[in-house]
Amino acid sequence: MGEREEEAEGVDKARIPLLRDEDEAKEEDGETKREIWMETKKLWRIVGPAIFTRVSTYSIFVITQAFAGHLGELELAAISIINNVIIGFNLGLLLGMASALETLCGQAFGAKKYEMLGVYMQRSWIVLFLFSILLLPMYFFASPILKFFGQPDDIAELSGTIAVWAIPTHFAFAFFFPLSRFYQCQLKNKVIAISSAVALVAHIFVCWLFVYGLKLGVIGTMATVNLSWWLNVFILFTYATCGNCPLTWTGYSIEAFTELWEFAKLSASSGLMLWILIVMTGNLEDTKIAVDALSICMSINGLEMMIPLAFFAGTGVRVANELGAGNGKKARFAMIISVMQSLIIGIIFSVLVVYLRDQIGWIFSSSEIVINAVNNLSILLAFTILLNSVQPVLSGVAVGSGWQSFVAYINLGCYYFIGLPLGFVMGWIFKSGVRGIWAGMIFGGTTIQTLILIFIVMRCDWEKEAHKASVRVEKWSNSEARK
């Protein structure tokens, strides 16, 4: 009996390390789940309101396009070209330039240099306003530009008239984008969401009034866009300057006029990076495919693109916050969580586009020909949505880390040396038309670009990046500290 008891005791002792390993594994698993949940909450505090805000602001253009589509095919084509080509180009550039604030404000907020957020925003206003002036010729000469690229005279002339009416919205971008980044970086995202909701509701009512009540036609639809965007700017500006952001808005500062060249260079890199990203979602027409059909697909893609771009903003802020606080590992963890969640959402929307391909065209047009053309492009649209669910998030990592210039070169290389040549071969050599051009740019340019960015972020020394962020925050805040 004694021997058996000793043997049993020996077996129990042998099991103890195994039991400890199981307990430790369970504890680690539970800790990982808690970390994922905590990071998800932090991310969605930014991404949730950002999605609502971006969808609301972009919906202003989509609703305008829908109203114009029911006025006639010429009106739909003209307003679509203005929204997707003229405004889209300038919006992408200015939106990207404003994302420089995600680097600077995000890292300053993480380092508790709160007063610098207001100074950075004022610098951004100045830089974006000056760039807005430089971009004005695109609006004044929209008709000859569109004719040069092969648009019919009637569409080009009407587009040129609408473009002039879009100038107030163009200048609203220069103030709205810095304001929204200012709030995002200090986690006041509900303010932007409420402001955007008010502007969207007002837009729907005023658009109906101008088009059906006052019979102002397609010019009336563009006038409502101006009113809605400036209403948004007014709400955000008033909230910030009336004492609701005491730590980050300390009034107008002469510091806003210092170091503008450094700020402009970072902003230009950001703008170029995001503009190329938006261009790569597809922007070429084919005479065999109705302009209306492609514009509808671009509007749907652009609307869904607001979700990855919200993750772009959220990832930029989260990575910048953690790097500014010196937490390199947490910055990497935030990046992984953001990429995975954006990819899941992209898969869901891709499936929805394929499933609803017979219905989505009716929102924008009553023409059977246009709706059938949209149906033919729906599979490619679904793949575009899926591929674009990852790349913007990785670009957000670049913004949070301050790599804008480097990533802009990657974007340029992939777009001009891979995407466009492949699109040319598929579109003209293999006679696939616009679908071939579109597929070449997306599958060639975006896919290669995404793989390169994945390689870069996976090999990144995050602790070294955290040190760089600390140096950057000190550099940009030294002048204010001396004051």
Which positions does each model-derived feature cover?
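Interhelical loop/hinge segments that connect adjacent transmembrane helices in multipass membrane
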Residues: 2-47, 218, 222-228, 234-274, ...
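Signature of the first transmembrane helix
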Residues: 16-27, 41-102, 265-281
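Membrane-interface helix-loop junctions in multi-pass transport and translocation proteins
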Residues: 33, 39, 157, 190-191, ...
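Interfacial segments at transmembrane-helix termini and the short loops linking adjacent helices
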Residues: 37, 146-166, 283-294, 356-382, ...
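Transmembrane helical elements of multi-pass membrane transporters/channels
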Residues: 45-64, 225-232, 236, 240, ...
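Helix-terminus/linker motif at the lipid-water interface of multi-pass membrane proteins
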Residues: 58-77, 146-153, 209-216, 268-299, ...
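Small-residue-rich hydrophobic transmembrane alpha-helices
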Residues: 62-65, 76-136, 140, 176-185, ...
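Alpha-helical transmembrane segments of multi-pass membrane proteins
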Residues: 89, 137-138, 153-179, 194-195, ...
